[in-house]
Structures are given as C-alpha cells and as structure tokens.
Amino acid sequence: MFAYVGTQGHMLECELRPGKQHCQSGTTAFIARSVETLQTLGLGGKCLLRLDSGNAAADNFDAFGDHYFIVKRNPRRECPEQMLALARRVGDKQDSREGKNVYTGFFDHFHPGSDQNRPCVPVAFEVIERTIDIDGQKLLVPKLEVNTWWTNLSCRAKTVLDLYHGHGPSEQYHSELKSDLDVERLPSGRLCANKIILLCTMVAFNLLRGLGQEVIKRAGLAPQKINIPRWRIKTVLKNIVYCAVQLVRHAGRIELHFGKRCRWFEVIQDIAHSFA
C-alpha cells in the first residue's frame, strides 16, 4: 500500500503486506500514520486526502482528522433509476453532447458504512444518462452510470470530481516504482526482508524524484527543452545518474571527472554547488 504527496509524486508512506491479507486490514492505521507523517512536514493548513473505493470503510474516516478528504464510494443498494430521479431534482445539469445528460450535486443523507450512529457525510454525485451512444446509435433503454464520492469539501460537486480525477497520476507513480526501479518482484522469500528493501526503495524513489525537480528548476541550463512539471524516474536515471564519470582520489579529495562532451554537466555542476 502506498501514499503519495504533492503533485510531483513523492512517496509519503509505503507498506508491504502478505497476499492473503484483506485490503482493509491495517488500512486505518496506515492512513493515521500517513496523516501523522504529513503533519511533520509542516506544510501549514489542511491537506486533501484522496482515496479509492477500496478504502471507503467507515473506520477510515476516524483517521482523517481535520483534513479534507475525497473517498470514492461504490453505490450498493441504490437503484440507478431512483438516483437519476433524485439527481434531476437536486443536481445541476452539465453541458454535454446530444443524447448524454450529466447531473452533478450533493446528497446529504448517507452514513459512512450505513452506520446510523455516525453523522451523515456529504456525498458528491455524478449521474450520467445516455440515450444515444458515442457512435450515434439511439438506445432503446437509457444507459445509466452513477458515480459517488464521500467528501467534506464545500466547493461545487464538479470541482470535487475534478480534484478526485487529479489523483490519476498515482497509478503512473506506481508504474515507475515497478518498472523504472525494477521492484515489481522483490528478491527475498522473507516478508520482513522485503519490507526493508521496499523502505530502501522509497528512499531512492524520493531522492530521484527530488533530483528530477532540481533539474527542472534549471531548465535554462539544460541541453534540451524542458516544459513539463515532472520527470519520470527513468528519465532522471538516463540523463543524470547514468552519466559516465571517472572517480579520482587525489590529495585527500574525491573528484568526479566528466567528459568534455557531457551534455548535462552544467546542470549537474549547478545542483552540486547548491548542496555544497
């Protein structure tokens, strides 16, 4: 299980679990630990926590503290037709193509985990009614799609949807961890050893992520145009870490000698001076 912070993809917490462990087992403690780690960063103000539907258990809400949250909620007992009728009555209709009606808004009568002892939490909804498919074929029976999210944000429902969809790059961060750092399969047959390896991987992941951000800050010194907010880990490895150098020990000093044709020398030198 992984928690990422910020828009550049730094890893906040990680936890390796046995395959037989239920996804909710230990999740509340993991969220509480992530929130505690987040507070030690001293960012100031409240943070927004975004979680998938697998983490929508009622116990997890106790770990959010005073922070804002958006948690994907899977409709279970609700009838889509009733949800559509309710959305038409209390929701806002969004602009869309012909044959597609999109309603967004809030429901205020749901309890987390259907536990009546818990206070109601607002639920942002998106109800989509399709009478014509994307190819222009009219449907005999309208196709309904209902999406809901637990949230304590006071903004418009459309903004809640956009904020939740903004956590999509987390899947890419996970892909970088597995492919770019080659940790899709952990080497040891012991869980405790693999946990240590994963923690070391998190340190390397964040160091490379930070190095990539330092390079982007020096885009003016780079030999190629950089107009993106974040570098993939493999790009950092290819352009910076894998630069060929000669390690020289002389007069009690350790020096790195770069070749005359090293394209990234000015960037690397400026980064090194900034941390000297």
Residue ranges and their predicted role:
Residues 9, 46-56, 69, 149, ...:
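Short, conserved catalytic/metal-binding motifs centered on acidic residues
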Residues 58-74:
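A short alpha/beta connector and helix-capping loop motif
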Residues 70-179, 270-276:
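An anionic, glycine-rich sequence signature occurring as long contiguous blocks
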Residues 17-19, 54-56, 74-76:
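Active-site beta-loop-alpha junctions enriched in small/polar residues
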Residues 153, 157-196, 200, 204-213:
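Short amphipathic alpha-helical "interface-anchor" segments enriched in bulky aromatics
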Residues 1-42:
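Electropositive, glycine- and tryptophan-enriched low-complexity nucleic-acid-binding patches
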Residues 55-56, 66, 83-84:
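Contiguous mid-protein beta-loop-alpha structural module that forms a pocket-lining wall or clamp
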